[in-house]
């Protein structure tokens, strides 16, 4: 029976590998912050994004987060987080 149980078992995520992955994300994030800061256009882009969102939903500036992450592989990721109000 143990052989069948081996094939049936679903692998649970290893907490060590999950912690390692999260730590790598944090380190990459901190390294990208050291490289000269955010580009000049980022604050203006954030303002324009907020203006577009405000056409449809009432939000404040602290409900929008815009972040540009760059890594060594010449790859940039623009992360936009918007906290929308509850609709009832």
UniProtKB/Swiss-Prot annotation:
Show the Pfam families listed in the entry: MinE (PF03776)
Q: Which SUPFAM superfamilies match?
A: Cell division protein MinE topological specificity domain
Q: What superkingdom heads the lineage?
A: Bacteria
What keywords tag this UniProt record?
Answer: Cell cycle, Cell division
Membrane-spanning residues where?
Answer: none
Q: Which Gene3D superfamilies match?
A: Cell division topological specificity factor MinE
Gene Ontology BP term (one) = cell division
Q: Which InterPro entries match?
A: MinE, MinE_sf
Q: Give the protein's function.
A: Prevents the cell division inhibition by proteins MinC and MinD at internal division sites while permitting inhibition at polar sites. This ensures cell division at the proper site by restricting the formation of a division septum at the midpoint of the long axis of the cell.
Family under the similarity heading: Belongs to the MinE family.
HAMAP family (alphabetical): MinE
What is the protein's given name? Answer: Cell division topological specificity factor
Organism of this sequence: Shewanella denitrificans (strain OS217 / ATCC BAA-1090 / DSM 15013)
**Its gene?**
minE
């Amino acid at each position: 029976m143990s052989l069948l149980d081996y094939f049936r078992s679903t692998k649970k995520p290893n907490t060590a590998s999950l912690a390692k992955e999260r730590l790598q994300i944090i380190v990459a994030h901190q390294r990208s912050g050291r490289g000269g800061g955010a580009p000049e256009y980022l604050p203006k882009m954030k303002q324009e994004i907020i203006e577009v969102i405000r056409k449809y939903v009432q939000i404040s500036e602290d409900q929008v987060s815009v972040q540009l992450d760059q890594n060594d592989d010449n790859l940039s990721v623009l992360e936009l987080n918007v906290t929308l109000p509850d609709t009832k």
